[in-house]
Amino acid sequence: MLRGQAREEDSVVLIDMASPEAGNGCSYGSTAQASEAGKQQVAPSRVGSSAKPPIDFVLVWEEDLRNQENPTKDKTDTHEVWRETFLENLCLAGLKIDQHDVQDEAAAVHYILLRAPWAVLCYYAEDLRLKLPLQELPNQASNWSATLLEWLGIPNILLEHVPDTPPEYYSCQFKASKLQWFLGSDNQDTFFTSTKRHQILFEILAKTPYGHEKKGLFGIDQLLAEGVFSAAFPLHDGPFSAVPESSQVLGLIQRQVLFQHWARWGKWNKYQPLDHVRRYFGEKVALYFAWLGFYTGWLLPAAVVGTVVFLVGCFLVFSDIPTQELCHSSDSFDMCPLCSDCSFWLLSSACTLAQAGRLFDHGGTVFFSLFMALWAVLLLEYWKRKNATLAYRWDCSDYEDIEERPRPQFAATAPMTALNPITGEDEPYFPEKNRVRRMLAGSVVLLMMVAVVIMCLVSVILYRAVMAIIVSRSDNAFLSAWASRIASLTGSVVNLVFILILSKVYVLLAQVLTRWEMHRTQTEFEDAFTLKVFIFQFVNFYASPVYIAFFKGRFVGYPGNYHTLFGIRNEECPAGGCLSELAQELLVIMVGKQIINNVQEVLVPKLKGCWQKFSRGKKAGTGTHPAPWEADYELLPCEGLFHEYLEMVLQFGFVTIFVAACPLAPLFALLNNWVEIRLDARKFVCEYRRPVAERAQDIGIWFHILTGLTHLAVISNAFLLAFSSDFLPRVYYSWTHAPDLHGFLNFTLARAPPTFTSAHNRTCRYRAFRDDDGHYSPTYWTLLAIRLAFVIVFEHVVFSIGRVLDLLVPDIPESVEIKVKREYYLAKQALAENEALLGATGVKDDQPPSSEPSLGLPA
């Protein structure tokens, strides 16, 4: 049943927790008042009591005191009204508010410290369907490699004891009326963890209005976008570096544990303390690092096998008969010009290029392609099991189906409500047909951006052709001989520049389009945004490698009848084949992108941090030790996980889709990821403000993208081996002519047609299976049939084996299934109500828990 949403007055608040005593907590003062830093001392955020809860959230805004009369004063006054209204509504929602100001002659920085009383926490914990513990269990986290090494009796250098290991719990959705059943409910100070408190505070901040909601005047995100507040963040629980004396007496706090045992470079060879990461940063961040560590571990066998295959290629360079024939051919093969203004050339001059091509094009690449296809299938199958185990252990297995609430931005702007069939509650609703129309409109924009990428690719192709002509005319013999490779290498660099520029533009455009599409939940919003950006980035990053792998050298023509693009002759593959050029392109894009990203991740946060400290140095106060909120404000805002996931998924594509051309790709990916894990860990622990802990039950649509890339990789490698490699022509020649491949080089070269020979008064050869008139020879058609048959057999074999592995490996481990049933039984026994089993019956208590004496509040 659909209903139009009633128009609400501006003064409506989420929950009226006001009381005669609330005024004390709401006296946050005027923005004109300021106190010197260091005069007001407040306990650190991790210290709290029932009398004064810990600091749960901090809001910050800056005020310029130099130009009170300026053209932007009207805007400043509007911001002041919005800010005061917002803070008043927070106060009415039950939050306790303190204000601390730091100023100098020029500017003031205002800090709003938010605390949530016990009653507010209980009310919103039930409203958000948060899961809280019923019974503690010993932490049974295990790692398959640790188990294997222990069984073999081999010392495990990856294992390290991390103090204060979080226990596991049986848990269920919180009900205030059944408070006594929950573990630790007798201690109001510790019952809600810091991450749970942050989630509740952020929900309140996201929904609180500061004007008319239908006009979009609600929520902290909009206030940050408008510049009303400059920051909103929960506090870290203390400094990340521990003082030796205090750590021995008091022990390490959670942030210090993560720094000492996870974020330090010296821990590159240790298991990640994922349970500690989850406890401090939430499930979404922990799942990212779990996936990154899992993927990196699986890269190790792929890197070893790929390195062995490459070394085999190095050995074959000096023993391969066709390569030796080419290098020792002297002036036996006079080759046709490679461009309209180029001269004839000797095939023996391309000896180095042919040897380089042999490094990547040999029989071992067929085995490696098959190995990597099955590797990718097994990687995803075992990740599903790992994900299911973590999702259960972290109480988020059914988060998306039952727990996840509509996005605040969606709830405020949706035109009607509808009954949720799972929870039985009325929720904001946006008609699906309207959303589909908007998504189709967004798809048109995506296609336009893809067209821009293709235009850039064509420009790079033309650049390479023109550059090859210019360099080939050089008087320098080295430059003339390497003209095509120099043009290809510089073209790869130009292509990388185009890629990085277009990426920045489209990400901003995709954010606008996805907000316009009105997705109900944050998960749906992120999935839609991710898919848009990935499709664009896929074309952006892979267009050039796809061109080299499957199109370059296919539409060249023959001497006397060459095909052109915009009047410029189409490119040919070099003497070593296009596979070596594809390997070069992959290494330039993949390794170049990794180096640029890692340099950015190291330098940019440092530079931003130094700039923030410099720009706010005069506002930091005169005290030796700044207050916790001042110290955290100097940190960088957390930018989320999207770019981290995108970087890894694009890398996964390079490792799998074109692995037949570059067996060293897994090795470079492994080395990068060892650095990436610690870089990302240091950013979250040391350089970022603490993000709001977000729940998630998996890595979202990224898993489906990885599955699609795995299927695409099988097809791509099959076509690479069949059409871009010399593997099948060599096999065919060894079967039909000479098993030792003597004469294979001459077999692959055609003679120029008589018309071309008479016009130039000189005969020449070119790479093709054509007769003397330029028509395809019977050998070409025979090889074409063999190639197509190879593609069909290869992909059927790999997909069949993958399907069998999918059936043999259960998605959820049996031990997890047993634990889920056990937890279901305990929840039923503890709550003894059918609504606890279903999450909710559809009718919520009319009164907030402030009316319940069991919550410890005055009646």
From Swiss-Prot:
Reactions catalysed, as given in the entry: a 1,2-diacyl-sn-glycero-3-phospho-L-serine(in) = a 1,2-diacyl-sn-glycero-3-phospho-L-serine(out); a beta-D-galactosyl-(1<->1')-N-acylsphing-4-enine(out) = a beta-D-galactosyl-(1<->1')-N-acylsphing-4-enine(in); a 1,2-diacyl-sn-glycero-3-phosphocholine(in) = a 1,2-diacyl-sn-glycero-3-phosphocholine(out)
Glycosylation sites per record: 746, 761
Region (Disordered): 25-50
Membrane topology (Cytoplasmic): 1-297, 384-441, 514-530, 673-700, 802-859
Extracellular side: 319-362, 463-492, 552-651, 722-780
Expression tissues: Highly expressed in the stomach. Expressed at low levels in small intestine and large intestine.
Keyword Hydrolase in record: no
Location of this chain's protein in the cell: Cell membrane; Endoplasmic reticulum
Keyword hit for Glycoprotein: yes
Entry coiled-coil feature ranges: none
Pfam family, one: Anoct_dimer
Assigned GO CC terms: endoplasmic reticulum; nucleus; plasma membrane
Membrane topology according to the record: Multi-pass membrane protein
Transmembrane segments: 298-318, 363-383, 442-462, 493-513, 531-551, 652-672, 701-721, 781-801
Keywords linked to the UniProt accession: Cell membrane, Endoplasmic reticulum, Glycoprotein, Lipid transport, Membrane, Transmembrane, Transmembrane helix, Transport
Single Gene Ontology MF annotation: intracellularly calcium-gated chloride channel activity
Domain of life: Eukaryota
GO biological process, one term: calcium activated phosphatidylcholine scrambling
Reported function: Has calcium-dependent phospholipid scramblase activity; scrambles phosphatidylserine, phosphatidylcholine and galactosylceramide. Does not exhibit calcium-activated chloride channel (CaCC) activity. May play a role in cell-cell interactions.
Additional detail: The term 'anoctamin' was coined because these channels are anion selective and have eight (OCT) transmembrane segments. There is some dissatisfaction in the field with the Ano nomenclature because it is not certain that all the members of this family are anion channels or have the 8-transmembrane topology.
Family label: Belongs to the anoctamin family.
UniProt name for this protein: Anoctamin-7
